[in-house]
């Protein structure tokens, strides 16, 4: 046994585990189109766990968005979702919607949001894998970072709040609006509705805390 002192890390609260899981799911939905296994799991999935207290308006909207996403999964086929994902976020020549959230942030000659993001990730010891083709500001990567912050509990709640407000919330809402405006967004219209509602829940929670 190592001589290093053992450290007890308490488990995540049910609320934080639900947050981390939902960030992970949203990251998966936007990183690549859902395959047959994920669609099957979502068809059987229950709504995100809620507290015993009555739901807020934001919580009710999130639950409704979840129900709509599950319903969309019932009639979805992987091949069609692959086509939709490709057309919306990859494109042949140019995607209909950019999934890189720094594109929805103000940029000045003095500051590049992506460079600032990379600097923040480097402070936490995070870096893009060499084989990764997507930049760090891809919506999926930012959601994965939020999940890492919640599950790792190394940076604390204030770091979650700062990262969320600095890189995720406002540009995420603009991304959701851009996807919703696309006529070709069928399944992903429901995915961005879930994301939008979840971001609103997170924003209110951070504002209260």
Question: PLM features: residue spans?
Answer:
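Surface/interface-facing alpha-helical segments and adjacent flexible terminal/loop regions used
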Residues: 1-209
């Amino acid at each position: 046994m190592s001589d290093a002192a053992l450290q007890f890390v308490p488990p995540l609260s049910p609320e934080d585990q639900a947050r981390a899981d939902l960030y992970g799911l949203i990251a998966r939905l936007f990183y690549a189109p859902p395959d047959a296994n994920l669609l099957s799991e979502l068809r059987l999935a229950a709504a995100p766990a809620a507290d015993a207290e009555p739901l807020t308006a934001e919580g009710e909207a999130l639950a409704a968005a979840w129900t709509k996403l599950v319903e969309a999964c019932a009639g979805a086929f992987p091949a069609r979702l692959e086509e939709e994902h490709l057309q919306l976020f990859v494109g042949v020549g140019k995607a209909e919607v950019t999934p890189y959230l720094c594109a929805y942030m103000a940029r000045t000659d003095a500051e590049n949001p992506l460079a600032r993001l990379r600097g923040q990730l480097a402070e936490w010891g995070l870096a893009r894998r060499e084989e990764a083709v997507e930049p760090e500001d891809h919506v999926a990567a930012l959601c994965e970072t939020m999940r890492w912050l919640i599950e790792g509990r190394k940076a604390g709640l204030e770091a979650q709040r700062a990262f969320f407000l600095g890189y995720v919330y406002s540009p995420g809402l603009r991304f959701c609006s851009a996807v919703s405006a696309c006529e070709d967004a069928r399944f992903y219209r429901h995915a961005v509705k879930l994301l939008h509602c979840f971001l609103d829940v997170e924003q209110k929670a951070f504002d209260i805390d």
